Amino acid sequence: MIFFERYEILFNKFNRSYLTSFGVFFPGLTILFSLILYNLGDSSFSIFTHYLSHLGIGPNGSNIIFNVGSMISGVVMVCFFLNLSVFLIKKEVSIILVNLSFIFGFISSVGIFMMGLFPGDISQYLHNFGAGFFFFGGLAYCILYGISEWTAKGISKLQALSGFVVAFPFLVFIYFTNINFFNHELALEISHFSEWILFTLLMCWIIGHEFSMKKDRRLT
């Protein structure tokens, strides 16, 4: 509780609104620019044949944009989860539930940072380790933040349900990726495609929550 209070005091000294608004769009912009650069160098890229992290080993500078962007995004996401946690505490959500949600958000953010720090052509093992942090942490925080918002005062049930909606593609991706571990050809296209669906829905969830928090700050 004291940690979140000190964070709120620190960032109230800055114009946090502009910083966080840019931050939540940063991961999506990173992917977009990486995709453009990749396709300028190799037009074979497809959401059915490539994972997101293939951008980290791509041509034409797409790898640099993706990997540096991933590391910055990891830091940005920690700030997002801090903001969301402070927001929920003000809505009288259980501090234990908020702490658990933030812990898994932090774990997922570390995973994003690691995926940028260790692209597949440097260390596939460490890259996969970071990916595991991101996906399993993401599944957990979507569920936990969803439960937190369901119990919060002044937050719509629709917003709370969005966490469970995003948790579902996490499960789908993890399921098909595990199938591919044992049979590489059985569900490869579905695994690739489900990750892109997951990323799209997750970005919508993050941006939607940022706008919700901004709206709440204007009303208070």
Name every feature range the model reports, one short phrase each.
Residues 16-27, 66-73, 101-108, 134, ...:
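Hydrophobic alpha-helical transmembrane segments of polytopic
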Residues 54-75:
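Interfacial helix-start motif at the membrane-water boundary
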Residues 144-220:
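Terminal transmembrane helical module of multi-pass membrane proteins
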